[in-house]
């Protein structure tokens, strides 16, 4: 049963919208929840991830790993995190991409725009 006549419930159209999304929309799709401490401090639940945020992986084979985001790979919907790597066949290390939904933000990289975003979402910046 459809709840809204304005939003399609077609799987085909939802997948097209997701995988054909422009970078500006992918930024919002790549949001992650804040840790409980940050949630109490800023009074918001989640934010789009960005480079230099500190995160903890909470799902998958890399569960428990912590580190700083070195790159947000929007084209593939992945985060590259320092110290989350694997060894290649030739002995070199390669970063492992982690999905934004599998992490929790533990420390925010705050600048003027980020503070404005938190206030706009109804949170508090101290």
UniProtKB/Swiss-Prot annotation:
<dbReference type="InterPro" id="IPR008991">
    <property type="entry name" value="Translation_prot_SH3-like_sf"/>
</dbReference>
<dbReference type="InterPro" id="IPR041988">
    <property type="entry name" value="Ribosomal_uL24_KOW"/>
</dbReference>
<dbReference type="InterPro" id="IPR005824">
    <property type="entry name" value="KOW"/>
</dbReference>
<keyword id="KW-0687">Ribonucleoprotein</keyword>
<dbReference type="InterPro" id="IPR005825">
    <property type="entry name" value="Ribosomal_uL24_CS"/>
</dbReference>
<keyword id="KW-0539">Nucleus</keyword>
<dbReference type="GO" id="GO:0042273">
    <property type="term" value="P:ribosomal large subunit biogenesis"/>
</dbReference>
<dbReference type="GO" id="GO:0003735">
    <property type="term" value="F:structural constituent of ribosome"/>
</dbReference>
<feature type="region of interest" description="Disordered">
    <location>
        <begin position="1"/>
        <end position="23"/>
    </location>
</feature>
<dbReference type="GO" id="GO:0002181">
    <property type="term" value="P:cytoplasmic translation"/>
</dbReference>
<dbReference type="GO" id="GO:0005730">
    <property type="term" value="C:nucleolus"/>
</dbReference>
<dbReference type="InterPro" id="IPR005756">
    <property type="entry name" value="Ribosomal_uL24_euk/arc"/>
</dbReference>
<dbReference type="GO" id="GO:0022625">
    <property type="term" value="C:cytosolic large ribosomal subunit"/>
</dbReference>
<keyword id="KW-0963">Cytoplasm</keyword>
<dbReference type="Pfam" id="PF16906">
    <property type="entry name" value="Ribosomal_L26"/>
</dbReference>
<dbReference type="GO" id="GO:0005829">
    <property type="term" value="C:cytosol"/>
</dbReference>
<dbReference type="Pfam" id="PF00467">
    <property type="entry name" value="KOW"/>
</dbReference>
<protein>
    <recommendedName>
        <fullName>Large ribosomal subunit protein uL24</fullName>
    </recommendedName>
</protein>
<comment type="function">
    <text>Component of the ribosome, a large ribonucleoprotein complex responsible for the synthesis of proteins in the cell. The small ribosomal subunit (SSU) binds messenger RNAs (mRNAs) and translates the encoded message by selecting cognate aminoacyl-transfer RNA (tRNA) molecules. The large subunit (LSU) contains the ribosomal catalytic site termed the peptidyl transferase center (PTC), which catalyzes the formation of peptide bonds, thereby polymerizing the amino acids delivered by tRNAs into a polypeptide chain.</text>
</comment>
<comment type="similarity">
    <text>Belongs to the universal ribosomal protein uL24 family.</text>
</comment>
<comment type="subunit">
    <text>Component of the large ribosomal subunit (LSU). Mature yeast ribosomes consist of a small (40S) and a large (60S) subunit. The 40S small subunit contains 1 molecule of ribosomal RNA (18S rRNA) and at least 33 different proteins. The large 60S subunit contains 3 rRNA molecules (25S, 5.8S and 5S rRNA) and at least 46 different proteins.</text>
</comment>
<dbReference type="GO" id="GO:0005634">
    <property type="term" value="C:nucleus"/>
</dbReference>
<dbReference type="InterPro" id="IPR014722">
    <property type="entry name" value="Rib_uL2_dom2"/>
</dbReference>
<dbReference type="GO" id="GO:0030684">
    <property type="term" value="C:preribosome"/>
</dbReference>
<dbReference type="GO" id="GO:0003723">
    <property type="term" value="F:RNA binding"/>
</dbReference>
<keyword id="KW-0689">Ribosomal protein</keyword>
């Amino acid at each position: 049963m459809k709840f809204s006549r304005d939003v399609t419930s077609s799987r085909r159209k939802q997948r097209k919208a997701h995988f054909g999304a422009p970078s500006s929309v992918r930024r919002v799709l790549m949001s992650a929840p804040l840790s409980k401490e940050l949630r109490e401090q800023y009074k918001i639940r989640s934010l789009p991830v960005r480079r230099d945020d500190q995160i903890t992986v909470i799902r998958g084979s890399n569960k428990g790993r912590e580190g700083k985001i070195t790159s947000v790979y929007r084209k593939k919907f992945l985060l590259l995190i320092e110290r989350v790597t694997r060894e290649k066949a030739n002995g070199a290390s390669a970063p492992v991409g982690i999905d934004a939904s599998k992490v929790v933000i533990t420390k925010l990289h705050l600048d003027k725009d980020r503070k404005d975003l938190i206030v706009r979402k109804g949170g508090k910046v101290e």
